[in-house]
Amino acid sequence: MGIPLPKPVMTQLQERYGNAIFRCGSNCVNGYRETMEDAHLTYLTDSWGFFGVFDGHVNDQCSQYLERAWRSAIEKESIPMTDERMKELALRIDQEWMDSGREGGSTGTFFVALKEGNKVHLQVGNVGDSRVVACIDGVCVPLTEDHKPNNEGERQRIENCAGRVENNRVDGSLAVSRAFGDREYKLGSGSQLEQKVIALADVQHKDFTFDSNDFVLLCCDGVFEGNFPNEEVVAYVKQQLETCNDLAEVAGRVCEEAIERGSRDNISCMIVQFKDGSDYAAEPHTTVVPGPFSAPRNSGFRKAYESMADKGNTTVGALLERRYDTLKAAEALTPEETEELSQFENGPEAKLTGAERQKWFSNYFQKLCEAASNGPSDQMERLQSLQQQAGIPLSILLSLMGEQTQ
């Protein structure tokens, strides 16, 4: 994972999809990571839908591949499909990634939802430690189980394949026992299911009542990484839905709450309701909400901030302009927001409008990038952030890191 950024990148990528039987909102934030490696998929038809969240590691290549591969696969499938067919698809998609020779890996959790009368039937697949968690009649109902190396059956397979479980990780490194990709754990002489790490999906089923207050969450493990267990996530969403009907906005609040509770990972949250979502069908699918530009002199933070703009199909100049205007229009600012606004100095001249005004913000960002290198300063900021998380004096942390490099 590396040393975390000194401040989280909280730019939100909101997505809204809907039709006559589904209403779906999702959100993701980069958080403290150097790169955003999550991906997700919503595919709707008049009678069924497919929903998935993919949490990449090493890079974002495998998670992005899974989004495309599952879309391509599901477009050709007859629904309903058997459990064996869902497992076959997962294994085939994994093998195609392996055959490509590319590096990286990803977890994947997904479900097919099929409307039958006044019921919606879910067929849930899971590979890894992302989760599907439902709220049924107000009660939290987990629909997946994390695939962790210390689970007895997983440990036995890993050890049978000449692997080891150390610190609850495969060979002391990988935190999940099932994943797509991760070729270094799939080089044994056995079959696709006789490897340290496999992409065999567990499949479960659950029925929901159409047009009820039930909902389903698909979340990467970053949501739960801090002190935010399933039951509290569901309770939090229920509470937010009492005053906010925008699922993408509520999903964003889940991401923010996860950061507040200690998560240092990328965070993705999708909320699905089984009711008329025609209002979402008419809206732009993607909205980018700029987060605080709170560490402008840190190169890692700037890179991650710009990357989130790219993923939202916008520019960092446009993002900073919107953030600046939001701060200027606020009736009151927190001390942190006041400091953030001051970093723009006097801002653009009043006479600048349109593309010229946006260019001012692009130039401001470029000047920060071209400033004299402050690499040591970057590193110290991030070390201080790591020290705060570890809860030990910085001098001891530096000493321990020095011992590990000897």
Swiss-Prot record:
Q: Tell me yes or no: is DNA-binding among this UniProt entry's keywords.
A: no
Residue ranges constituting the PPM-type phosphatase domain according to the UniProt record = 23-274
Species, as recorded: Leishmania chagasi
The protein, known as: Protein phosphatase 2C
Cofactor, free-text remark: Binds 2 magnesium or manganese ions per subunit.
Function, as annotated, reads: Enzyme with a broad specificity.
Keyword annotations for this protein, in alphabetical order, are:
Hydrolase, Magnesium, Manganese, Metal-binding, Protein phosphatase
Q: What reaction does this enzyme carry out catalytically?
A: O-phospho-L-seryl-[protein] + H2O = L-seryl-[protein] + phosphate; O-phospho-L-threonyl-[protein] + H2O = L-threonyl-[protein] + phosphate
Quote the PROSITE patterns the UniProt record gives: PPM_1, PPM_2
Oligomeric state and partners? Answer: Monomer.
A GO molecular function assigned to this protein is: protein serine/threonine phosphatase activity
Q: Which cofactor does it need?
A: Mg(2+); Mn(2+)
**PANTHER family annotated for this entry?**
PROTEIN PHOSPHATASE
Q: Mind telling me which Pfam families this protein's record contains? A: PP2C
List positions binding Mn(2+) 1. Answer: D55, G56
Positions with a binding annotation for Mn(2+) 2: D55, D221, D265
